[in-house]
Regions:
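Active-site metal-coordination/substrate-binding segment of hydrolases
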Residues: 82-149, 155, 167-171, 431-434, ...
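Midchain, well-structured core segments that form catalytic/ion-binding scaffolds
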Residues: 154, 160-342
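An extended, acidic, His-containing surface patch that forms the Zn2+-binding/catalytic region
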Residues: 65, 227, 265-330, 336, ...
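Predominant activation on well-ordered alpha-helical scaffold segments within soluble catalytic domains
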Residues: 23, 54, 125-132, 161, ...
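Acidic/His- and Gly-rich active-site-bordering loop/insert found
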Residues: 2-115, 139-141
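Acidic, glycine-rich active-site loops and adjacent beta-strand->loop/helix elements
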Residues: 89-91, 145-155, 177-181, 210, ...
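Generic non-transmembrane alpha-helical segments
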Residues: 10-17, 21-28, 52, 56-60, ...
């Protein structure tokens, strides 16, 4: 890789605009909702985020194309071959526990705070301004670089499925939606939804979780009668980040367990409030076999050992499982797990094992629809060039690695995830107080600019 003084000068000149643009994007609470119009399949706020992004692309001299509200795209460069850069505008719900406005985009002590700063509006804006700097620097590209900004990455990627059917996806590219240096392997993804009858009149309700791909940081249960003292005795978690609160309301006890949210691909980084609540209920003897077995089989770890599905391979590492959604009411309990499984594992076997483990308590598993694992060899031209850019700019000698998260990259025949979180950096995606280091945001844009030049020039 060779440095380009003109490109670096353009990147420097664009820094202020880049930061202000990200703040503008963050201030739109683009959480998926029901279709609100023909061109708003994911709700009005997501549509507003798309309009905001397209307006900025036009302002910067690019020509965005609206793909029926599912996403937008824009290109720079010439030639028949296309390299894709895939980012997304939708975010997970903000949840509780924020110290600042989750959509305020405040900059405090060098960090911009807000939902979407790291996942994935920040990386998207960095890619936009990388492309703008290349345009301003007048660098000719023999391949086209196509930026695609999606609107449904967090809830199943229907946006890219629609795009692929209507437009068609390039074969190669990267998604700035994870970590540097580079991720060439993504585990398979599996949603395991189970249901069982619940025969205990004392258990009025359980509610925990907003999305299956988030470790729930709050869990609430309502019990008939006064269970305040017994519940306090049953809560055996010694952690300042976790708590149990109880109150008597109209003769019933409302229990609220607080934990710490995290991305479901790294459940060990969170403290699962749903599992803590299940453990309390099991110790109280409430909920019968469905609660007792759930606590025994899934309430104590996140590697799948107690469910009988634990394991790993050399390519992608260990299986993880997150109890992401837990609801009970009117004699029924609904449990949904997010499982990230290694490349060489069979998802059907995982589902069958979980069903067998929980069947004694009456649980039935819905049909599974796995997201298959994804792997790009380290020896590929794509990986080699992107790693060269990263290592040259950072001075490191880093190697690619695997993650449990699923990014847009898996939709490409040869796609990888590439930043924008740096090694050792504070990672707060899907958590309260999500934020990014502004200096690293600027640094990532520089890496993306040189990466696009390396792949397309």
């Amino acid at each position: 890789m060779q440095y380009n003084e003109k490109l670096d000068a353009e990147l420097k000149a664009l820094e202020g605009d880049m930061i202000e643009t990200l703040q503008r994007w963050i201030r739109v609470p683009s959480v998926r909702a029901e279709r609100s119009a023909e061109n708003a399949p994911f709700g009005a706020d997501v549509r507003r985020a798309l309009d905001t992004a397209m307006a900025d692309l036009k302002r910067l001299g690019m020509e965005p194309r609206d793909v029926d509200g599912y996403c937008c795209d824009t290109e720079i460069g010439e030639g028949d071959e296309v390299i894709a850069v895939l980012s997304h505008l939708d975010v997970v719900p903000e949840g509780d526990g924020w110290d600042h406005d989750p959509y305020g985009a405040e900059i405090i002590d060098g960090r911009m705070i807000g939902r979407g700063t790291s996942d994935d509006k920040g990386p998207g804006v960095a890619a936009v301004f990388a492309m703008k700097a290349i345009l301003n620097a007048g660098i000719p590209l023999r391949r086209r670089c196509r930026l695609i900004l999606g609107c449904d990455e967090e809830c199943g990627m229907q946006d890219l499925e629609y795009y692929e059917q209507k437009i068609g996806l390039p074969d190669r590219g990267f998604s700035p939606d994870a970590n540097f240096p580079l991720i060439n392997t993504e585990k398979g993804g599996l949603k395991l939804a189970l249901h069982a009858a619940l025969d205990d009149a004392r258990l009025i309700e359980i509610a925990s979780g907003t999305r299956v791909n988030v470790v729930p940081n709050q869990a609430v249960s309502v019990l008939a009668g006064d269970w305040r003292e017994a519940a306090a005795d049953a809560f055996d978690v010694d952690d300042e980040d976790c708590a149990l609160e109880s109150e008597l309301v109209d003769g019933n006890t409302r229990l609220t367990v607080t934990g710490v949210s995290a991305h479901a691909s790294v459940p060990e980084k969170g403290k699962n409030a749903a599992k803590m609540l299940v453990h309390v209920l099991a110790k109280l003897g409430i909920g019968g076999a469905p609660i007792a077995l759930l606590d025994e089989a899934a309430g104590r770890e996140s590697a799948g050992e107690d469910l009988g599905i634990a394991g790993s391979d050399k390519v992608s590492g260990a299986l993880t499982i997150n109890l992401g959604l837990l609801f009970a009411r009117e004699g029924k309990i609904d449990v949904t797990f997010d499982c990230r499984y290694p490349v060489f594992f069979n998802p059907e076997t995982i589902g069958e094992t979980v069903q067998r483990r929980l069947a004694p308590a009456g649980y039935a598993l819905e049909p599974i629809k796995p997201s298959v694992p994804h792997h790009v060899p380290e020896s590929s031209e794509l990986v080699s060039k992107l790693m060269d850019v990263y290592n040259t700019i950072t001075g490191e000698s880093a190697k690619p690695f695997a993650i449990g998260g699923g990014t847009y990259a898996r939709h490409l025949k040869e796609g990888v995830a590439y930043g924008m979180m740096f090694p050792g950096e504070l990672e707060l995606e899907h958590q309260a107080n999500e934020s990014i280091d502004v200096a690293n945001f600027v640094k990532a844009a520089r890496i993306y600019a040189y990466a696009i030049v390396a792949l397309c020039a």
